[in-house]
């Protein structure tokens, strides 16, 4: 099993979700996060002082797939999220030793 994690522009979340659904992915976990990198932040004025806000809002998407599906799923995410602009995000795959569905006790692929 592989854990696919993607940090995306929030606006890319829906197109990625639709593309993954077309690929047969039926579930994922999404959370809000923030970070900074090459995109840099933005400036705001607070009480007359100009502040640089380094952290930019992002969406974090996580899903479990069988080993053979990892590369195709990463490709689907990249194609759906890519705009060509700085800040499009990152996607990576990490190995998962074991998965257990808490409700039933199923393990491995059956738990996903």
Can you name each region flagged by the protein language model?
Residues 1-112:
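Positively charged, small/polar-rich N-terminal and surface patches that mediate targeting and assembly
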